[in-house]
Amino acid sequence: TVSGRQPLKHVKEGRIHQPLDHFNRQAVNTFPQRFFVNEAYWQRPDGPVFLFIGGEGPIFEFDVLAGHHVDMAEEHRALLLAVEHRFYGDSINPDSLKTENLADLSSQQALADLAVFHQYISQSFNLSHRNTWISFGGSYSGALSAWFRGKFPHLVYGAVASSAPVKAKLDFSAYNNALNSCCLAVVQEAFAAVEVALMGGNVSQVAVDFGCCQIPKDPDDQIELMQNLADIFMGTVQYNEEGFLMSINELCGLMTNKSEAYEEEMKIYRSTSEEPCLDISHEKAVKDLMDTSLHSSRRTARQWTYQTCTEFGFYQTCEDATCPFSGMLTLQVDTQLCPLLFGISQHSLPARITFTNTYYGGDKPHTHRVLYVNGGIDPWQELSVVQDRTEEEEEAQTIFIEDTAHCADMTSRRVTDRRSLKKARKEIENHVARWLKTAAQEKMEKRGV
């Protein structure tokens, strides 16, 4: 219980029938969009509304029960909402995930969903201009939070965008720059050793060493292996100590001990894997991505791959000389999935990325009352807003947390939090409180009070 209340009893799940295509007035087909509501803290009828926006995956009751936005909702007596992104989780196009149906999957359609959802909730709870809406999100949904405020400023008064990659980028090689420089060389050495073993024909030994389900004889399978190994390091850097397998310092500590780099990489993989063997079949990976049935909706890879092909890129390549992983991880390898899975030409990708940045403003958007929060060791900060436009803004629009990783600010307060994280959360709280106070003052002025 919190403040004598039992929030779980106040959580309700609902569905709203959204148009599959908001921009075609002749289209009549709909899909069910899932949402959660928590009224435990809400001060009727004029309390604020805190909207948690779902990203590239399912939402959960947890999204209206825990997190920094929930802590603030309790303080400000807000109505809590969480809404699922179209085509993820249970909010699926009932006609399957075939390519022709994915045409309605885009961030633009998702923002239109939010606008319709705003209207639906306003009618359902008899809300009015007296209820101030603030949106929250992290990573892709953080970008949606910023864009929702940017495109629909009359609906949402302020937005918190945590670790939000608002700039689309085709070749996101800069993702790899965040790896701790102290173990950069030894990681490069380890990946080079695996490559040498593969190129030297020692594929059977590599399969044994890394517990592969298949012997990586095919070049595509070898690339799958290298991507699997790189993912361990990428995930560690992205989330650092926020609940991932190990921290950067722990990983670097293992990599820089007296053993051979290859052996250490092998041990690290085996210690992090929960599977009986490492599936490196490229053919199976592609087959999984081609699965269009609704039962595969919990696996988000097909939908998100489509969005990377049509809107964002975000391909974490390794052709840059500074990349510590394998040079086998190329832009060509990543983008060849676009024509293979969806019939989208690789040559069309740059224009699609340019459109996204033109439409939203990239990392230099002219947004007001959007707070961009980023961690100093989060690779995605490269695509977010990290500097204030001081000459245009009355208040800061960025918070930079020197020693934290991806979306660290979004969790509830903990006694073990770093001082910098506690300070950042306090800054976020101050912004939200200031927005609510300003909104209340504006409403009083309009009423002539």
Predicted region positions:
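Alpha/beta-hydrolase fold nucleophile elbow
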Residues: 127-140, 144-145
